[in-house]
Amino acid sequence: MSIIHLPSRPDTVRWGTLPARGDRPVAAIAAGDTLRIDTLSHEGLLEEQGKNPLGFFQAQGVATSDILADAAAIAAESDHPRGSGPHVVNGPVEVRGAKPGDWLAIDILRLSPRVDYGIISNRHGKGVLPSMPEAGRRTVSIFARRIRMNGEDIGIMRKTGPDAIDAYHTYLAGGAPASLPEPDDPDTVAFPLHPFLGIIGVTPDTGEHLSTVPPGDFGGNLDINLMVEGTRLYLPVFVDGAGLYAGDPHFAQGDGEVALTALEASLEADLRVSVIAGSDFARRFGLLQGPLLETPDYLVTTGRALHLDDALEHCVEESLRLLVDGCGFDRAHAYAYLSAAADFDISEAVDIQRGVHAAIRRADIGR
């Protein structure tokens, strides 16, 4: 089996839109190969942040040598269609032999930080609270850094003060760059990191280049913080070759992602991709409609809709399909088990299509 490297270049990424049916793949892999992707965060590249990642991150106190050259190249050379999403996605990648009706099994083998910093943004009233940002601001971007503390990767951010966009404008006007947040400063807060990719998806069966923002049965912007190293993601295939893509790297995210983004930061990702016949998948997991996660301890079903109540309902129905079709329950007993033993959590409440996921203990159901 091979390791195929997929860098972030203007010819290997899409900015703001998903691949569509008929798009030419930027790479091809065989089932069982590992895709090594230099994923790139969109934060620091966006127009409201100056579309100048070199200057933007210098203004936060980041050394020039620690600012990614591919970020600068994408900002300068790639097209970002007006009205599209913010995300940079690598792909599409052809998975040889994958055809509609099959499922991809994507093992998340490794997620390594490419940088030691990231950004959390609240923009355009699109978080959970439409009243935020305050004081007429369209966007607030908060800088955070990654440090090693007591053997663990930790995020550090300030509690108060100017945001990263203010720091950038001060720097452009000739002011000094901001100082990096330090763990011994009482005006900072520390929190644990758990790197994951917010976007892993397959190409939907449409000729339209959809926005990267809403997720779907094809995966995409799922923003489920369980998509960490050691998790397997299953996705249904809709077009020949699957058209796999990935992006939206995070250092950390709370369930709900309430401010709109979480700690967005670039990662190198190793994804091993396999193909499963639809009939084999159905025998094991039932007639699911959309993404399924498998962690060491849980099977995680997913649901999406414009409103959280409907997303929860969708997720419950997917969970019932798993238990009834794949695990021998009848519908009444499956519903009772879910009520007693499964946790339904908000994946995200900010991506147009709201997301809910359910964690079902594998030990309970013999999986």
Residue spans for each PLM region:
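Basic/polar N-terminal segments that are highly enriched at the extreme N-terminus
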Residues: 1-9, 367
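N-terminal, Lys/Arg-enriched amphipathic/low-complexity engagement segments
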Residues: 7-82
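Short alpha-helix capping/helix-loop boundary micro-motifs
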Residues: 18-24, 87-93, 217-222, 321
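Short, well-ordered loop/turn sites that connect or cap secondary structure elements
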Residues: 29, 95-98, 227
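Long, hydrophobic/aromatic-enriched structural stretches that serve as scaffold segments
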Residues: 66-115
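Glycine-rich anion/phosphate-binding loop at the beta-strand->alpha-helix junction
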Residues: 103-285, 293-295, 317, 324, ...
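Extended amphipathic ligand-handling, pore-lining, and cofactor/metal-binding catalytic surfaces
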Residues: 287-306, 316-320
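Extended C-terminal subregions enriched in glycine
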Residues: 310-314, 321, 325
